């Protein structure tokens, strides 16, 4: 199942990333439990500086083990939805516990990839999987 999920996400992310300049600084919110987005983006954009932001020390420790052969950085903090202009790209998970509508209305970074339900199409969008009922939306400032 993990291989299927990784392939499906990779296809969607690869397609969306072609829609603009390659980001050099990326923040991934909540990517610690299973860092699929970090695994994919470090392969698609090997020159990019990637930071995983997660409030859980245990999740970050798991991510460190899975990403040991990468240069990914880790920040133990809760993402508050505020401005993240220091990054070219911010990635927000489906499980984001915050104001998703505010992310769409006022993107906190120049480009924001929002994992969302398949019926919530916003901006430039790609379906991840019908089986997962999931899509990724790309929002730009």
Describe each PLM feature range.
Residues 1-22:
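S-adenosyl-L-methionine
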Residues 69-79:
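Conserved SAM-binding strand-loop segment of SAM-dependent methyltransferases
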Residues 22-34:
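Conserved class I S-adenosyl-L-methionine
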Residues 63-64:
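Conserved SAM-binding loop
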Residues 56-58:
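Conserved SAM/SAH-binding beta-strand->alpha-helix loop
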Residues 49-54:
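Conserved SAM-binding motif I beta-strand of class I
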Residues 100-141:
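C-terminal substrate-binding/active-site "lid" region of AdoMet-derived donor-dependent transferases
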Residues 33-47:
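Conserved SAM-binding loop of SAM-dependent methyltransferases across substrates and taxa
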């Amino acid at each position: 199942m993990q291989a299927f999920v990784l392939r499906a996400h990779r296809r969607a992310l690869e397609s969306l990333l072609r829609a603009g300049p390659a980001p050099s600084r990326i923040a991934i919110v909540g990517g610690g439990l299973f860092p699929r987005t970090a695994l994919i983006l470090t392969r698609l954009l090997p020159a990019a500086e990637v930071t995983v932001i997660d409030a859980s020390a245990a999740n970050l420790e798991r991510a460190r083990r899975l990403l040991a052969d990468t240069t990914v950085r880790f920040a133990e903090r809760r993402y508050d939805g505020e401005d993240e202009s220091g990054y070219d790209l911010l990635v927000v998970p489906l499980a984001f516990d915050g104001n998703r509508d505010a992310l769409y209305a006022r993107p906190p970074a120049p480009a924001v990839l929002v994992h969302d339900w398949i019926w919530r199409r916003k901006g430039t969008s790609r379906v991840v999987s019908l089986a997962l009922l999931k899509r990724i939306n790309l929002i730009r400032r």
